């Protein structure tokens, strides 16, 4: 089930983004990992990381997303663990200590854990001040005797809220038990974040957008233009309807891209079913079922056509 869902989401991400430039070679495969990532685009960040590494993982997510009981049940089913900030009150903050223990328990059981090191997600490029979550979990795990590496992960988007955006993923030099000598907790947390910040910024320097390799140049785009236009016409009504709904649901939040992707992912089979039903009503009979392989293929061709030489 997990593998099927992971494959489906990864395929959908490849259609949603114009290009995913992923270099995850430094992450051990297999192996239990504590992944410490920057956080530019809410839940979409978790999907990108989880679908580009083979490890099964759970995620630390902002606690306010768990306020709705139904949402909380769904998020926990997706192996998400709530974490809270000081601004949400001391009672909530105490729950975060329990969340760190839960993350440590998952690591010891063999499941990798993804932590967003900045804590707060903001739709902006660059690296913000790091929180202490990743450092605290690492300290807890290492003190317990587990030899689990911390993998710095860098995520960067070419732009936000636009179709076919570029995104880059990188994994950096591992932070291993023993890299930081035994220290008092405050010194350890500060030293850990100093090392993590340096390695995240090293990865950021390797990202360059707009340099997509073109194959065939202008002639290739000429050949792709007719099916790409078909892909645009077949998908535009569905896409813009879902986009308008997403804008209404996420007004004033940073969840636009995440909710848009989620709604597109869930509603796409319904859109294909509607197109199939339309074909049957028009008397196309068996030909109508070609919607299922052909229409997604035209979307893929539209994505490729947009890569200008």
Go through each PLM region and give its residues.
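Soluble catalytic domains of membrane acyltransferases
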Residues: 2-9, 14-175, 229-231, 240-309
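Short His/Asp/Glu-rich catalytic/ion-coordination signatures at enzyme active sites or charged loops
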Residues: 179
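Compositionally biased, charge-rich terminal segments
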Residues: 1, 45, 63, 205-222
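Transmembrane alpha-helical segments and their cytosolic interface motifs
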Residues: 218-237
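Long, charge-rich alpha-helical interaction segments
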Residues: 182-214
């Amino acid at each position: 089930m997990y593998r099927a869902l992971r494959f489906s989401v990864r395929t959908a991400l490849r259609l949603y983004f114009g290009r995913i430039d992923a270099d995850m070679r430094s992450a051990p495969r297999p192996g239990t990992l504590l992944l410490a990532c920057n956080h530019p685009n809410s839940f979409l960040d978790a999907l990108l990381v989880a679908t580009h590494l083979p490890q099964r993982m759970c995620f630390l997510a902002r606690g306010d997303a768990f306020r709705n009981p139904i949402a909380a049940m769904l998020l926990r089913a997706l192996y998400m663990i709530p974490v809270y900030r000081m601004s949400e009150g001391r009672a909530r903050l105490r729950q975060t200590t329990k969340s760190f223990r839960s993350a440590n328990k998952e690591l010891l059981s063999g499941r990798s854990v993804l932590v967003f090191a900045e804590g707060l997600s903001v739709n902006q490029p660059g690296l913000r001040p790091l929180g202490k979550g990743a450092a605290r979990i690492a300290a807890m795990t290492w003190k317990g005797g587990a030899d689990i590496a911390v993998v710095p992960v860098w995520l960067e988007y070419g732009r936000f809220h636009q179709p076919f955006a570029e995104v880059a993923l990188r994994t950096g030099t591992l932070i291993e038990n023993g890299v930081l000598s035994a220290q008092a907790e405050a010194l350890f947390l500060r030293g850990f974040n100093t090392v993590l910040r340096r390695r995240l910024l090293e990865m950021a320097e390797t990202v360059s957008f707009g340099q997509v390799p073109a194959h065939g140049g202008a002639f290739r785009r000429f050949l792709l233009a007719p099916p790409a236009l078909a892909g645009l016409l077949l998908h535009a009504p569905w896409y813009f309807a879902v986009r308008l709904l997403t804008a209404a649901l996420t007004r004033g939040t940073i969840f636009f891209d995440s909710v848009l992707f989620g709604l597109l992912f869930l509603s796409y089979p319904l859109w294909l079913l509607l197109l199939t039903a339309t074909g049957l009503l028009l008397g196309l009979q068996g030909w109508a079922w070609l919607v299922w392989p052909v229409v997604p293929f035209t979307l893929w061709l539209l994505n490729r056509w947009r890569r200008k030489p």
